[in-house]
């Protein structure tokens, strides 16, 4: 089965790739993450993924345009509900690309994170699969999260501290500032 794997970052992807390859799935990575801010963060994550993909022989398709403004316009009206729109944005683009490029299915490394809203991601992926007529290959990768983080550290990957969006970064720093006396 030829599957397009949306990849948010190399640390999240390494165990997803290992699991799926272990199942005999033929993978191609897909970089599309308009939510990531600032540009230096976007570039660090993208470059880390490029190096990792090359090292493990993973073909990689890149929708490599820094699209912060369209992302912010999309989510700004409902900051609290931004994650649903962000998941949909990335998963619909992954499904569209999978259909156009002749893949049998698609999935995402987002499904490894215990910090993401898993059921909302799954619903978005299922809607995207229906719209584009390509199978959504669901896997709950969360049990592999810690092993993936450990492996990423062993490999010297760039390790980020937030999901990527400007609003998540803001929340992170606001929480930290409240702990400082």
Regions found by a protein language model. Give the residues of each.
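Nucleotide-activated chemistry modules centered on ATP-dependent adenylation/adenylyltransferase
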Residues: 1-181
